Amino acid sequence: MANHKSALKRNRQAAVRNARNTHIRSTMRSLVKMVRVAAASGNQEEAKTALDRAVPYIDKAATKGVIHKATASRKISRLVKLVNTVG
């Protein structure tokens, strides 16, 4: 347990940031999964729609520092490649 006032504040800030980052990461994973499921079903329109929702969210997560920029770029690249091979 932290004893200093500043350390207590840091603990509170870390908890809030952790909750925010966990939510962003979880939502991002759900959106990526929706793209993969739509692509697996063979429905290109649905896959493109899901991709259009996922890409800005992944970019936003990278901008906020939740994931690395290169990781975001790699995820987007793989999803676009997957959607383009559907149908």
From Swiss-Prot:
Single GO BP term: translation
Entry's Gene Ontology cellular component terms: cytosol; small ribosomal subunit
Gene3D superfamilies per UniProt: Ribosomal protein S20
Pfam families listed in its UniProt record: Ribosomal_S20p
Keyword Oxidoreductase found: no
Keyword RNA-binding on entry: yes
Basic residues: bias regions: 1-12
SUPFAM superfamilies linked to this entry: Ribosomal protein S20
Residue numbers spanned by region Disordered: 1-21
GO molecular function, one term: structural constituent of ribosome
UniProt keyword list: Ribonucleoprotein, Ribosomal protein, RNA-binding, rRNA-binding
Role, per record: Binds directly to 16S ribosomal RNA.
PANTHER family in the cross-refs: 30S RIBOSOMAL PROTEIN S20 (PTHR33398), SMALL RIBOSOMAL SUBUNIT PROTEIN BS20C (PTHR33398:SF1)
Family classification: Belongs to the bacterial ribosomal protein bS20 family.
NCBIfam families in alphabetical order: S20
Name under which the protein is recorded: Small ribosomal subunit protein bS20
Organism the protein comes from: Syntrophotalea carbinolica (strain DSM 2380 / NBRC 103641 / GraBd1) (Pelobacter carbinolicus)
